[in-house]
Amino acid sequence: METPTEKPIVLPDLIKTLYESLQEEHPLVNNVAWWQIHLENVNGHMEDEEQWPALQKNLKKTFNIWQKNWKKWAVNSLDTLLGKVLNLPAHISAMSLSYEIFSSVINVWTSCVSTEEVDETDCSDFLKKEITSTSSTIALTPIAVAGTSGLVKSSPSDLFRKLANQSNSSGNSSEQTGTMSSSISLYENGESVQYTLEEKVGKYRVTMNVYDGPESLKKEKWYQAPIARITMSVNSKSTKLAVDQMLAVLTEDFMKRKPIRQGNSHTYGKRQKRY
């Protein structure tokens, strides 16, 4: 294992050495959750190391930033990862490490990887846990519906009952320039409750339909068993992060089912030529 000894050792050197030494047997080095899980595992073995608390804090910040910007980082190689890490604030990217802490982390990390296997399911579960943790800080109160705090922790049935009992006649019902209509509809036992508003388009425009799988099989058309239909703008950073992470988790879960890739399409959003 190559170690940097003739120049100051910095945090990116640690990541580089771990990546290079583990990538052959552990292709999940390109998955941020793999690093986050092992960081937690390593943390329990480094309590007596004087420099570890500061290093652990900066490693955690690095991985959190990576997770938050997973789409922009698009890590698929060591060069890509290092390029992003080196552009982080200097207190992270230029954090100096003693050779002792560098060697100790390498040894403990390698040992944890060998004894505590982390697979794709573990990574997926970790990201789901992170989404739940993040989402728990996101309340629906910015929508002009009184008494909806805490709904993110509720089941669809709980949501239905709570929203059905709310009354909001003072919402923004007048059409405004530069806005789009947003709505949320919840369904239960043949009944529905809906709220609508006009709002400016945010960073994302999200449309999501959720259906009851077993019930859809009993219907003439599968889409006749809805649980929720949502069309809304995503404006806050925390909500955007939740959407990004949900896309990551759902995509990873779907790809594990080994779908068949279809032909590329270059006509989306373009007018097709007719001959």
Swiss-Prot record:
Protein encoded by which gene: NS2
InterPro entries, sorted: Non-structural_NS2
Protein's name according to its UniProt entry: Putative non-structural protein NS2
Phylogenetic placement of the source organism: Viruses, Monodnaviria, Shotokuvirae, Cossaviricota, Quintoviricetes
Superkingdom in the source lineage: Viruses
Biological source species: Junonia coenia densovirus (isolate pBRJ/1990)
